[in-house]
Amino acid sequence: MLLKEIIREELEEDYYNYYNNLGEYSTGKGDDIKEITNNSQNKTNNNNNITILTSYNYNNNNNNNNNNNNNNNNNNNNNNNNNNNNNNNNNNNNNLFVSHSSILRSSSSPSSSESDEYSNGNNNNNSIINDLSSSSSSSSSSSSSSSSSITSPSSNHAYSPYNRSHKGIKISPNNKQVSSSGLLGSTMVSTSLIMGASNINNNNNNNNNNNNNNNNNNNNNNNNNNNNNNINIINNSNTNNNSSNSNNTINTFNFNNNLNNLNSINNNLNNYSNNMNINNQHNHQFNHYNNNNNNNNNNNNNNSDNNNIHFSNNGNMNIYNPNLSNFNNNNNNNNNNNNNNNNNNNNSNINNNNNNNKQIGNIVAKDDAEQLKESWKKIKEISNEFIKLSKLATKSDLQSIDLIPELRSKVMDLNNFLHVIEEKGELLKTDERQQKKRMESDKNAEKREKRREASRLLNNVCRNCKTTETPEWRKGPDGTKSLCNACGLHYAKNVKREAAGLHHLNEVGKKVDLTSILN
C-alpha cells in the first residue's frame, strides 16, 4: 500500500507539472479561459459517501455516428472486458490512468480478481469519482466507464485520463483541478471543475459499426484522437445537427446543459444500487445508413420507425428527434411521387399504344379501301374482256367454243373479287373516316334537296330553257330569278363583253335582243 501511495503521489505531481506547463490552449486565447465550478450540481449518495457529479452534453450529430451498435455488441462487450482492462493501462494512444481506492463500475464490470489491478479494495473511502464516459453513443459504455474511471481516495480533485497530446484540458495552477467534458451521457464527478474542452466525440464512420469486437478497444482511442470528426472544440466551432434543425453547439468553456436536465439526471442517479452498478447502455438506434439508403434507393420506404433517437440512461431518458421521421416521410413522399410519375408514364405509354392502335386501324382501313378500289378496277377489266370475247364470238361461231375456258377463268376471278369486296365492305362500315364522308355527302344532298323544293314552290320557269328545276335562279333581262343557273351565268358573261365594247349598247337604252346576247 505504501508503494502504491508513493506511485500515486508521483503520478499526481507529474500530471500537475505537465498540465501546469501546458499553458494556454492552442487557440492562443488564454485570457478567455473561464473556471466554472458546479458545486450546485453535486449529488451525494449516502450509502457510499461518494459525491457524484453528472453532466450531459447532448450532441445530435447523427449522420455517421458510431451509434448503430446492436445488442450483439453488448454481448461482445461483456466478452471483451479483459481486453478493456488491459487497454486501460496499455493503450496505443498513451492514455494515462490513475486508479485507486474504489472504481465506478458498470453492470458488466470485471471480476474482483481483475479489478485488483486498478483498486486497492477501499470501497468505503470518501472519494470523488470522475467518470469520463469514453463512448457516449456505442453500447460498450459499460466497459468504458470502468476503464476511464479515476479515483482519488485522499484528494478532492480528479485528474483527466486523456492523452498528453490533447490540448483541450486545462488545470488551474491554484486549485490543481482538471476539467473534462463528455458527450451523450458521460458522467463527470468533481466538486470544483474548470469546464475546459475535451475533444471527445464518438462520431465514427459506419466502418467502425462493423467492428463489433473492437468497439471496446476503440473507445479510449475515440476519446483522445478522433480523426473522423470535423468538430474542433478548441476553436469553439459548432456541430450542426444534420438530422434536425437545432444547432447543437459544443462550447470550449461552457456546457450547453440546463440545470433542469442535470437535476433530472441526478435524480436518476439516486436509483443506482449500493454496488455502484451504473448501466450506461445507450441503445442508440441511429440507422442513418438507412436514411442514406433512402436517398440512394427509393425502395426503402419502411425505415421511418428506425429514425427515433433513444438516449437511455437506465431507461429514464428518451429523446425523440422528429425531424428524422419527417426526413423519411419526405423520402417516402418522394418515392410515392416517383411511383405516381411511373404510373403516369405507364398511363401515357398506354395512351400512346392506344393511339398507335388507332393509327394502325386507320392504316388497315385505308388498305381495305384501296383494296376495294383495286378489286373494282379488276372487275371493270374483266367486264371489258367479256365484251371483247363476246364480240369475237359473234364474228365466228367456231372460235367461241375455244373461248369458253378463258371465260370460266375470268368468272372465277370475278367471284373472288366479289367475295373480297363483301368482306372489306363489312370492315369499312365501322371505319370512322368512311362514316364522316358519308355524313358529309348526306348533308350536301339534303341542301340540294332543299333548294329544289324552294324552286318548285316559286313556280318559276327559265325564260331561255323553260326549265323548272335549278339549284339557283339568276338575274336575267326580265329581272331577278328570270333565268336558271346555267342560262344566268351565260347571260352575265355576255353582258360583261358588251360592256367592254364588243357589242356597244344604244345610247337611248333600247332593250338588247335576248337571242343575240345568249347566242
From Swiss-Prot:
Compositional bias annotation for Polar residues: 172-182
SMART domains referenced in this protein's UniProt entry, alphabetically: ZnF_GATA
Zinc finger (GATA-type) in chain: 462-487
Disulphide connectivity of cysteines: none
A Pfam family: GATA
SUPFAM superfamilies: Glucocorticoid receptor-like (DNA-binding domain)
Ranges of compositional bias, category Low complexity: 37-156, 273-357
Stretch list, region Disordered: 25-182, 198-249, 273-359, 431-453
Keywords tagged on the record: Coiled coil, Metal-binding, Zinc, Zinc-finger
A GO cellular-component term linked to this record: nucleus
Annotated InterPro entries: GATA_ZnFinger_Domain, Znf_GATA, Znf_NHR/GATA
Keyword field contains 4Fe-4S: no
Protein name in UniProt: GATA zinc finger domain-containing protein 8
